[in-house]
């Protein structure tokens, strides 16, 4: 077994174990639990070895796209092996065609009458008849498919063997350093599993000059050895203790500046380093082992940004750090609802009656709206420039290449096409084209300014939101022993309703969902729970909003239109989000935790 294959199988087993842990929640409580610390430091542009970095991330990008191409071919071969015709598949196909036809008919009626209120009694009745039939037939199809799978198991095993052989062959010919090769193969393995579970295909990546190079230490690299600059994978020039402990901020800033060298690749078994100026804004624990180190190249607007990421295993006295004596349980209801002070993302209720909420204030919402405004300004400028150019080009005698480049200008939707036209015109000026050139040059300057503004603002507001979520997660995980969340699939909130269920959601609601980014908050909360050894569990979310927490009466109401609701049975007045959090808390205390 090759080194790459053994490493990949080990990581696959780890992913499987992690998946099982996530399904039932996680609870880090043993004294032997290892503590890991992830640190990130800002870097300036490389002073040496940038060509090695670019070479490795380009090769990683190319290998990924080749793996995706081969995986799609493999998936097609599997489908060919598993294809079979039966009475069940024929009936499923007929019913699905009828269902799609009815839904298209509903859409056309709404479009014709320009309203969501149309008489759809007959179509809805037929759809309700088709749905249970389809469900039953698909269950039967699964049983038939399982028999086919068993019958063709050897063929599928052979295809899987061939796929893995192709992966190894592509890896050998990629020219990647072994750490970077493992990084791509591991990402590929995780990506293909996610695509398979979602019923989709893996996606190709567009080359934009971003990526990372990584080094990994299987037994760990002592921090002192890294600062001694003798290791052939990672070196950081040592800094004085004043970089972190001097009372004068200016001295701390000056002393924390140093250089990092990370091995990007090899030549004749000799290391080729990338060197970058780095700011060690916080101390790296001396009694720690470095497990992985990465230099990441990101793009913000028209420029590239670099950072150094370190993952450390804490040793010595800090291995089992003393945590505060946590007690109590808190339940959190997630969502996105506009309130007076901003956008409410979460409501928390604990077992002592305390409640609080997480709100993205109006300043954050204003910044998100400004991003949208800048996009609108760019689009209007683009459309106005197109209209001017089409009129001006009519007055010029254009060569064939210029005619070809501008023939479909009226249908352009991308600013990139206009930038390519600007570049072409700069290199191929024509007699009497001064007005055309002025229009193009004015547009380019304005476009670059607006684009830089938009992308930098986007970067700032996303980082600001993440910091808000981190602070809130850190605060509650240092207070409670158990955190309870509702169990629901976030991607279901993105799916549009079927036509028979009503018109599609409004744009503001969809935009608020994007601004809230519930998945990001949930990830930050999960990370904080792991770090502080807090139990993190899920309970079913069904009916938590419509069930009164005081009397238990279930009553359907328009949850989107009203935040405050009065129970028709007991007369209790409650906020529906806090009500849901109280129901989650009560359910978890009754042993309903998953």
From Swiss-Prot:
GO annotation, biological process: defense response to virus
Keyword line: Antiviral defense, DNA-binding, Magnesium, Metal-binding, RNA-binding, Transcription, Transcription regulation, Zinc
Region (Target nucleic-acid binding (TNB)): 541-575
Binding annotation for Mg(2+): 577
Cofactor note: Binds only 1 Mg(2+) as opposed to 2 usually seen in other Cas12 enzymes; lack of the second Mg(2+) results in loss of target DNA cleavage activity. Binds 1 Zn(2+) within the target nucleic-acid binding (TNB) domain.
Sites where the protein binds Zn(2+): 548, 551, 567, 570
Region (RuvC-I): 330-540
Region (Recognition domain (REC2)): 86-153
Region (Recognition domain (REC1-N)): 1-85
Cofactor(s) demanded: Mg(2+); Zn(2+)
Coiled coil spans: none
Location of the region described as Recognition domain (REC1-C) in the Swiss-Prot/TrEMBL record: 154-211
Family matches, as Pfam families: Cas12f1-like_TNB
Gene Ontology MF terms: DNA binding; metal ion binding; RNA binding
Domain of life assignment: Bacteria
Region (RuvC-II) residue spans: 576-594
Region of interest (Linker), residue spans: 315-329
Region (Wedge domain (WED)): 212-314
Free-text comment about domains: Has a bilobed structure, with a recognition (REC) lobe and nuclease (NUC) lobe. The REC lobe (residues 1-314) is formed by the discontinuous recognition (REC) and wedge (WED) domains, while the NUC lobe (residues 330-594) is formed by the discontinuous RuvC and target nucleic-acid binding (TNB) domains. The crRNA-single-strand target DNA duplex is bound in the central channel between the 2 lobes while the non-target single stranded DNA is bound to pockets in the REC and RuvC domains.
Record function comment: CRISPR (clustered regularly interspaced short palindromic repeat), is an adaptive immune system that provides protection against mobile genetic elements (viruses, transposable elements and conjugative plasmids). CRISPR clusters contain sequences complementary to antecedent mobile elements and target invading nucleic acids. CRISPR clusters are transcribed and processed into CRISPR RNA (crRNA).
Family: Belongs to the CRISPR-associated DNA-binding protein Cas12m family.
Other notes: Part of a type V-M CRISPR-Cas system.
Name this polypeptide is given: CRISPR-associated DNA-binding protein Cas12m
Encoding gene, per UniProt annotation: cas12m
């Amino acid at each position: 077994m090759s080194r790459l294959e053994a490493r990949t199988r080990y990581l696959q087993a780890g992913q499987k174990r992690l998946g099982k842990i996530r399904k039932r929640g996680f609870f880090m409580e043993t004294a032997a639990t290892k503590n890991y610390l992830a640190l990130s430091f800002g870097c300036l542009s490389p002073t040496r070895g940038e060509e090695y970095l670019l070479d490795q991330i380009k090769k990683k990008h190319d290998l990924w796209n080749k793996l995706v191409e081969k995986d799609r071919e493999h998936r097609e071969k599997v489908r060919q092996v598993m294809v079979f015709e039966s009475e069940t598949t024929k009936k499923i196909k007929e019913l699905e065609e009828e269902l799609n036809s009815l839904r298209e008919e509903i859409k056309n009626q709404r479009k014709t009458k320009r309203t969501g209120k149309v008489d759809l009694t007959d179509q809805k009745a037929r759809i309700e008849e088709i749905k249970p039939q389809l469900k039953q037939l698909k269950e039967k199809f699964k049983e038939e498919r399982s028999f086919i799978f068993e019958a063709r198991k050897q063929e599928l095993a052979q295809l899987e063997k061939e796929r893995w052989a192709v992966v190894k062959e592509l890896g050998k010919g990629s020219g990647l350093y072994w750490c970077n090769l493992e990084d791509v193969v591991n990402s590929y393995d995780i990506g293909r599993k996610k695509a398979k579970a979602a019923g989709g295909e893996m996606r190709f990546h567009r080359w934009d000059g971003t990526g990372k190079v990584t080094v990994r230490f299987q037994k760990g690299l002592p921090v002192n050895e890294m600062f001694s600059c003798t290791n052939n994978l990672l070196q950081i020039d040592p800094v004085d203790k004043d970089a972190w402990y001097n009372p004068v901020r200016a001295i701390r800033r000056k002393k924390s500046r140093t250089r990092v060298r990370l091995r990007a690749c090899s030549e004749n078994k000799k290391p080729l380093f990338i060197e970058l100026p780095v700011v060690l804004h916080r101390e790296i624990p001396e009694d720690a082992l470095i497990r992985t180190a990465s230099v990441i190249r990101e793009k913000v607007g028209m420029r590239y940004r670099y950072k150094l990421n370190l993952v450390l295993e804490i040793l010595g006295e800090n291995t089992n750090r003393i945590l505060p004596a946590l007690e109590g349980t808190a339940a959190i209801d997630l969502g996105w609802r506009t309130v007076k002070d901003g956008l409410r993302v979460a409501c928390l209720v604990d077992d002592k009656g305390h409640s609080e909420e997480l709100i993205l204030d109006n300043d954050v919402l204003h910044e998100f709206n400004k991003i949208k405004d800048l996009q609108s300004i760019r689009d209007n400028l683009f459309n106005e420039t197109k209209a001017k150019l089409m009129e001006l080009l009519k007055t010029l005698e254009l060569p064939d290449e210029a005619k070809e480049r501008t023939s479909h200008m009226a249908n352009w939707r991308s600013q990139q096409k206009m930038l390519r036209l600007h570049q072409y015109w700069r290199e191929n000026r024509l007699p009497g084209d001064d007005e055309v050139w002025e229009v193009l040059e004015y547009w380019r300057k304005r476009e670059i300014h607006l684009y830089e503004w938009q992308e930098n603002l986007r970067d700032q507001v996303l980082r600001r939101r993440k910091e808000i979520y981190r602070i809130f997660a850190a605060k509650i995980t240092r207070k409670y022993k158990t955190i309870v969340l509702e169990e629901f699939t976030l991607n279901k909130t993105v799916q549009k309703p079927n036509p028979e269920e009503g018109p599609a959601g409004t744009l503001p609601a969809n935009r608020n969902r994007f601004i809230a980014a519930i998945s990001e908050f949930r990830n930050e909360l999960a990370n904080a729970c792991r770090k502080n050894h807090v139990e993190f569990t899920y309970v079913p979310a069904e009916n938590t909003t419509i069930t009164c927490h005081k009397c238990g009466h279930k009553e359907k109401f328009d949850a989107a239109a009203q935040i405050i609701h009065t129970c028709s049975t007991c007369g209790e007045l409650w906020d529906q989000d806090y009500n849901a959090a109280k129901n989650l808390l009560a359910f978890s205390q009754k042993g309903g935790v998953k």
